[in-house]
Amino acid sequence: MGAPKVKATSTAKQLQAFEKHLLKDIHALNKMLHEGMFEIDKIRIGAEQEFCLVDKYYKPAGKNIEMMQMLGKNPLFTTELAKFNMEINATPQIFAKDCLSVMEKEILDNLDEAHRAAAELGIQIVLTGILPTLRKFDFSMDNLTPYERYYALCASINKLRGKNYDLNISGIDELFSEHDSPLIEAANTGFQVHLQVRPDDFVDMYNISQVIAAPVLSSSTNSPILFGKRLWKETRIALFAQSVDTRSYKEHAREMSPRVTFGDHWLQKSILEIYKEDIIKYRVLLNTEVQENVFEKLKSGTAPDLMALKVHNSTVYRWNRACYGISEGKAHLRIENRVLPAGPTVKDEIANAAFWLGLMVGIHKQYGDVTKYMEFDVAKNNFLKASVHGLDTKLFWLDGKSYAAGDLIIKELLPIARKGLKQHKVDKEEIDDYLGVIEDRVREVRTGSYWQLKSFNKLTKKANKEEALAAITAATIQNQKDNTPVHKWNLAELGANKDWKPSEIFVEEFMTTKVFTATEEDIVALVSEMMDWQKIRYVAIENKKGKLVGLATSRLMLRAYMKHIHQEEKMPLTVGEVMISNPMTIRPDAKLTEAMEIMTKYQFGALPVVDDKNQLIGMVTEANFLAITNNLLEKVK
């Protein structure tokens, strides 16, 4: 978040004061760049490990405050936006020798500590780009971590947005969903990698980070499923962009920039271009009380915090973020790679980091200014294709040719990454180990996304989506304990989720969403035929505004049809005349047991599921309960 004490800007005076400090920070940074006031003799790397908290049923567990209380003496842990997410800030390492394995060990040791704390709370932790078992109602404001900065961020984004957030993501399935807050962004968990960069190299290195974002992402995708829908290979990219989009439709038309962005052009002169552009394009969301006098600090030879600049930078979400920081009293610049997902294992994550770090250095050595070899729009389009398709796509490279992503990585990029790591004197054993993980994963086309999708497709042939997603999450947790790279994992099995209980399932998780509907004006003959064609017994009836107004059953339709067929009225019988008007309904966040009680008590064969606007979003039928019963019987065998 850039600073612990931030708040929403509520008055013009607050805004003006913050803007003043923002301008001072820009001028101070400019002075520092011109006078060479940055550390250049050391290059460090760093990482941020985000993870999810889940209960014994593998559903989100909003316990990060309790976790922080138990882990309070460990300064590396911090909270995230949602109560079911946390983060570890790894200690920066000098980019040399055994830096990668040291980082891996530190993250594993801290995750072990988190596992122990979680076990005392009756919960578990999992590394994944998007938690498969997330449900829409998990993103109510009740799950917002209760810190002022998070309330301020959501309030500021909502104020700029002025309306609900629509998700529209298409892959194998399609997701159309509306949410009333940007908390939906908390579905994303990532593994951010940092590389310290000398000021003189910053422009070239930043542009390189843009070029390699696509191939690095294509080899590391791990977020293919959201709300039970199979979407992009790295759905985080689309979800993050849409969840914090503060623009109105008019602003879309004016081509105003989204706050989550890959960028629109190459960097040309310095890091200042990025910061100035962000101030021009993006309104201030948060502010903080700035105490320091940046120019007095510069006069005394002390590196300033540039807190106003940090706060504003933290509310602009570039996939490659330009960062200013201080290490051991010296100012430095770094590039934060925000592209990579969390998981599938720490071993996989460090391998991804090694690949990216090696490419950053190796391509700089081999090509220098990459803008001479590739148009920016090509790099941006590559990134989009990698997000959607992962390894199943073709990418353009610096030679102007198009390659299958896997071939490009194996034949061209891994050798360059190897040279880059060697240049920084990283131990040969580490290079072989981590780049070997990337090579095997790519050759076998076994990314985290591949594993999740193959497991999901297999499991849903004999279980409902909810149980399949719980099994995938359970298997992920088990495999992470062994730290075995994902390309060696067996597909998930239903037995992995031993604590699965149907009584803990919510309606949203097992209802049928592919619901056939009709209108009141449709004739009985047509709807009867539709039910026969689709082999269904219930059809929801909607009015012209899409509101649920009735329910048609096969018995009612057949009875009306048979009675009417022998009569000679001129006007055909309509569904509105025979349907069950204003049928009993249920909410998506009700428990399975509640649905069963209603259907048993009233001898219903179907129960429409509606939202708070009485819009139909699904249907619970006897078939849903039969599927769950069948799975329970299989477990008893």
Question: Which residues does each PLM region occupy?
Answer:
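Residue-level "edge-of-site" marker
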Residues: 130-131, 434, 544, 559, ...
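Conserved helix-loop functional segments at active or binding sites
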Residues: 325, 365, 533, 563-567
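Tandem CBS (Bateman) regulatory domains
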Residues: 492-514, 528, 553-602, 612, ...
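Cytosolic beta-strand hydrophobic patch enriched in CBS
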Residues: 518-520, 537-551, 586-588, 605-619
